[in-house]
Every structure is written in structure tokens, then in C-alpha cells.
A protein has these predicted regions:
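Sec-dependent N-terminal signal peptides
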Residues: 4-13
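Phosphate-group recognition and catalysis centered on beta-loop-alpha active-site segments
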Residues: 16-263
Length: 263
């Protein structure tokens, strides 16, 4: 009888335990539905992946990786070289639009590579679009021209209704983007982050791999007036750990699980 009473008491206490609330933390789909996640139906950074992700209630927006071609077109693509994921080879920065337009991803669906201006109409004023600016062309070993990239970005986003934020990992490019866009610096090196916070006073925030930052470091950046977004969490445990660090947002590769944990 005592055991039954104790068991009942435990049930009552457990049922009354308040669930952790993470509603204040934004959830942003990484490349749409996620990058390199086995449960993703479509390849990341495609129209299909972004469109599907935006149908999930509670998702605040998407992050996409963007690269500039020789003709000034901006394409969604994550890797440095095309032969890792597509039917083509080389680097986007060394190729013309007509060539890239004919490529497909090496997937069952064979999705086409898409331009940035193809996904812009998918996001309304309630959504956020994070643009991860890829500045380096690994085929020639050089960074691209930031002025040309910025001009192409302005053109592609001319009819945008959503909120736009850019992610920059090349320190030299920060001064070009800060005056025009909400700009986030991406790095796992906290000495570099602090240096750029002091050098570029207009920074909006930082984007950091979730395993490379502590809860106290997150709070330290927030105390300096910066927004903090964490990425590269794929497992339920990783998502939970990232949420508990109390960032302003997370960029998970499993948005279904992130929405379960965070909403």
C-alpha cells in the first residue's frame, strides 16, 4: 500500500512538472529541411527543400548557402565544388549560368540547382531568410569580389517581403555588408569573434557551431547586444543541448525534431 501511494505521488509530481519553454528561440531550417540529414526528403538548398520546410508551423525561416557565378547570378549550393553533389564539376564561381542551369543533384529526385531569386517569393513577411555568403572559389584559390557579390545580392532581393540576414565568415567582407544588411559573423574561434565585435561595431550577431560554445559564452555575447544563433545539431539530444544554451535561435538539420523540442 505504501509503495502504491508513493508511486501515485511520483506520477502526480511528474505530471505537474513544467515543460521547458523555448518558444522565444527562433528555429531556422538549415538549407531548407536540413543539410546531409537522412530523413530529408529533398536535397538541401533546393526549391523543393525550402518550400517544404516553410510549410511546417512554428518554423521562423530558412538558411541557404549562396555562391556567385561568372555572370553575376547567385546560386544556392553548400559545397565548394560541384562534383561532390551534382552531375557537373568545377566551382560555381568559375562557371557560367547556362552550364549550372543544366545540372542536377545526384539524388533520386534529381533536383535542379536553383538561383536565389527563385526562393525569394516563397517567403512572406512573417519569415526570416538567412543567407550564408560563400566568398571563396576553391578552383582558383581566391576570394571573389565582394562588391560584385553585394550588387548581385541587392538585385536578387529587390522584391523581398521577408526579413533578410546575412552570414559572413570572411572577415574582410564584413565592412561591405554591415551597412546594408543585418550581418552575422560566423566562426568557432572566440578570440576572432571578440576581435571582430570590437572592430566592426555594426555587427548584428554571431553564428557558432553549437558544440563550440558554452551557455555562459552565449550569454556574454547577448550581454554585448549581439544575437546568437547555433548550428550543426542533428540528433534530438544535440537539439536539446543547443536550446538549453539559450541562444536567440538555432539552425538545425532536423526541423521536425527541433519543432517538437522547441515548440
Amino acid at each position: 500500500m505504501k509503495f502504491e501511494s508513493l508511486f501515485f505521488l511520483c506520477l502526480v509530481l511528474c505530471s505537474c512538472t513544467k515543460r521547458e519553454s523555448f518558444n522565444h528561440i527562433e528555429i531556422i531550417g538549415h538549407g531548407g529541411m536540413g543539410v546531409e540529414h537522412p530523413m530529408s526528403i529533398y536535397h538541401d538548398n533546393t526549391v523543393e527543400s525550402v518550400s517544404l520546410a516553410l510549410q511546417f508551423p512554428g518554423l521562423n525561416g530558412v538558411e541557404v548557402d549562396v555562391q556567385l557565378d561568372l555572370d553575376g547570378e547567385l546560386w544556392l549550393y553548400h559545397d565548394m565544388e560541384l562534383d561532390t553533389e551534382t552531375s557537373g564539376g568545377g566551382c560555381i564561381g568559375s562557371l557560367h549560368s547556362n552550364f549550372i542551369m543544366d545540372l542536377n543533384y545526384n539524388t533520386i529526385q534529381g533536383e535542379k540547382l536553383c538561383r536565389l531569386n527563385q526562393i525569394v517569393p516563397l517567403l512572406d513577411s512573417s519569415k526570416v531568410l538567412f543567407i550564408d555568403v560563400k566568398s571563396f572559389n576553391s578552383c582558383d584559390g581566391l576570394a571573389q569580389n565582394p562588391i560584385l557579390f553585394l550588387e548581385s545580392l541587392n538585385t536578387a532581393l529587390s522584391n523581398t517581403k521577408c526579413e533578410v540576414r546575412v552570414i559572413i565568415s570572411n572577415t574582410d567582407w564584413l565592412p561591405y555588408f554591415i551597412p546594408f544588411y543585418q550581418t552575422y559573423y560566423s566562426s568557432d574561434q572566440h578570440a576572432e569573434i571578440e576581435n571582430n565585435i570590437n572592430t566592426h561595431l555594426g555587427l548584428t550577431g554571431v553564428v557558432v557551431r553549437y558544440s563550440s560554445i558554452t551557455e555562459s559564452q552565449v550569454q556574454s555575447y547577448k550581454n554585448q547586444g549581439l544575437k546568437v544563433f547555433l548550428y550543426e545539431m542533428r540528433s534530438p539530444k544535440g537539439i536539446k543541448r543547443a536550446l538549453r544554451k539559450n541562444p536567440d535561435g538555432i539552425i538545425p538539420d532536423d526541423i521536425r525534431r527541433a519543432l517538437i523540442e522547441g515548440r
